[in-house]
């Protein structure tokens, strides 16, 4: 679980990177569909799934909106992300293993966009936080 120090580190990092959330989401989702092409199956209803397309940008923005929500609900991710968990489990039917894949892409993008802020301590705390988000999103699958 997240310590108070982890929570503080995530909040501090988010305060610096939050205004770039749309760009982070676009880049992370674009990387995911290139590096893990099997994830394209969830977006087969889109006319264009190429990196940086309008649909990728819009969904990247939506994903990062979910991350922003998670930051605001950091003290109780399970309850705070309950609606998103239900949506991903029952409506979208996303394999929860993909949350880990996208988390990795988000970490890569943040590390390249914000190298000075992405300290080893920030990396560990953000990784733990994103793992907690993935676990909370997978809650309704049980």
Swiss-Prot record:
Q: Which UniProt keywords apply?
A: Acetylation, Heme, Iron, Metal-binding, Oxygen transport, Transport
Question: What is the tissue specificity?
Answer: Red blood cells.
The task this protein performs is described as:
Involved in oxygen transport from gills to the various peripheral tissues.
> Which organism does this sequence originate in?
Notothenia angustata
Q: Which GO terms describe its cellular component?
A: blood microparticle; haptoglobin-hemoglobin complex; hemoglobin complex
Further comment found in the protein's record: This fish has two hemoglobins: Hb1 and Hb2.
Q: What are the binding positions for O2 in this chain?
A: 59
- Top-level taxon of the source organism: Eukaryota
Gene3D superfamilies according to UniProt: Globins
One molecular function GO term is: organic acid binding
Cross-referenced PROSITE patterns, in alphabetical order?
A: GLOBIN (PS01033)
Q: Which positions are annotated as binding heme b? A: 88
Matching SUPFAM superfamilies: Globin-like (SSF46458)
Q: Which PANTHER family does the protein's record reference? A: HEMOGLOBIN FAMILY MEMBER (PTHR11442), HEMOGLOBIN SUBUNIT ZETA (PTHR11442:SF41)
Asked if the keyword Plastid belongs to this entry, the reply reads no
Protein name (Swiss-Prot/TrEMBL) = Hemoglobin subunit alpha-1
The family note in this entry says: Belongs to the globin family.
Sorted alphabetically, the Gene Ontology BP terms of this entry are: hydrogen peroxide catabolic process
Q: Which residues carry this modification: N-acetylserine?
A: 1
The UniProt record lists the Globin domain at 1-142
The record describes its quaternary structure and partners as: Hb1 is a heterotetramer of two alpha-2 chains and two beta chains, while Hb2 is a heterotetramer of two alpha-2 chains and two beta chains.
